[in-house]
Amino acid sequence: MNLTLLATEGFGLNFNLFETNILNWAVVVFGLYKFLPGFLGKMLQKRREGILLELKDAEDRLLNATQALEKAKKDLSSAAEKASQIKADSLKRSESIRMESEKKAIEEMARIKQSAISDESSEASRAISQLRKEAVELAIKKALDSLPNRLDKTTQENLVTQSINNIEVN
């Protein structure tokens, strides 16, 4: 359109149906009114069914997840109780093992001490026995050395008779 022409003629309404495309608009609006609800309705219905199906699926997953969470919580509390029980049992067991090992160590120390005492005592008794033996041998040697000088014939006969009598008594 020409701008100069519009400026000179002014603003007005055109009532010519064929020039204004009112019929075209009426056909388009009628067609949309008649056919669009069926086509668009089917699309919206499918979309609605899809959304409802997805919502139901999401609710089912939520329910399953909630049930799994509850089961996991129960399992966790059960595992925690079992772990605390195992810990308590292991503490008791370790304490009993420690006490038992301390008892064995004390018994072993007592046995070693007793062994040392008995070794010392047997060593002492061996030494005493050795000293006695040496003292007896020394006394016998001294007696034998001094005996020929002190023993005469009658004393020797009395000694032999006395020894024979002692042997017969025993």
UniProtKB/Swiss-Prot annotation:
- Any Pfam family hit: ATP-synt_B
Q: How does it sit in the membrane?
A: Single-pass membrane protein
Q: Where is this region: Disordered?
A: 76-98
State the UniProt keywords alphabetically: ATP synthesis, CF(0), Hydrogen ion transport, Ion transport, Membrane, Thylakoid, Transmembrane, Transmembrane helix, Transport
InterPro entries tied to this protein:
ATP_synth_b/b'su_bac/chlpt
Task: Mark out the compositionally biased spans (Basic and acidic residues).
Answer: 89-98
Entry keyword NADP = no
Query: Which GO terms of the cellular component aspect does the record hold?
Result: plasma membrane-derived thylakoid membrane; proton-transporting ATP synthase complex
Bilayer-crossing regions: 22-41
Compartment(s): Cellular thylakoid membrane
Q: Name one GO molecular function term.
A: proton-transporting ATP synthase activity, rotational mechanism
CDD domains from the xrefs? ATP-synt_Fo_b
Record text on subunit structure and interactions: F-type ATPases have 2 components, F(1) - the catalytic core - and F(0) - the membrane proton channel. F(1) has five subunits: alpha(3), beta(3), gamma(1), delta(1), epsilon(1). F(0) has four main subunits: a(1), b(1), b'(1) and c(10-14). The alpha and beta chains form an alternating ring which encloses part of the gamma chain. F(1) is attached to F(0) by a central stalk formed by the gamma and epsilon chains, while a peripheral stalk is formed by the delta, b and b' chains.
Instruction: Please describe what this protein does.
Output: F(1)F(0) ATP synthase produces ATP from ADP in the presence of a proton or sodium gradient. F-type ATPases consist of two structural domains, F(1) containing the extramembraneous catalytic core and F(0) containing the membrane proton channel, linked together by a central stalk and a peripheral stalk. During catalysis, ATP synthesis in the catalytic domain of F(1) is coupled via a rotary mechanism of the central stalk subunits to proton translocation.
Q: Which family does it belong to?
A: Belongs to the ATPase B chain family.
Q: What is this protein called?
A: ATP synthase subunit b
Per the UniProt entry, what species is this protein from, by scientific name? Answer: Prochlorococcus marinus (strain AS9601)
